[in-house]
Amino acid sequence: MDLPQLNFNETYHWEIRADKGKFFIHDTARRTWLQLTPEEWVRQHWLHYFHFTKKRNLSALLLEKKIELNGTTKRIDLLVTEKTQPKILVECKAPHIKLTPTVFEQTARYNSVLQAEEIILSNGLQHIVADFTDGKYLFRPWEW
């Protein structure tokens, strides 16, 4: 499988295996094998970034958590918590997906439920960050 090089400063160790023509990646947090899709490749980079680089406990990293939004169930990609409080909401897209205002609006809707202090939109190549304070988003440059 040809995986794109993503825009992360660190290089991580990956456990990847093939089975019946499909590729799977081991998810450290959920302790399971997941089909390796382009979006999952990005999500796993963020998981490794927060766990191995930022030294967050795996228990503070919630992946594909269900939330209720306007009577429908949605799944967020990654929520970083601190003492069970939402801190950073990460919305992952496949590398070929552009980060558009629609992607931001989707993430902001999810955050209307969660109230995380920061959101990150990422396709693995580009990262957009916004702080959420007093009901408003303030975009800022991504800093490693």
Predicted regions and their residues:
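A short, conserved, highly charged catalytic patch centered on acidic carboxylates
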Residues: M1-E118, L125-W144
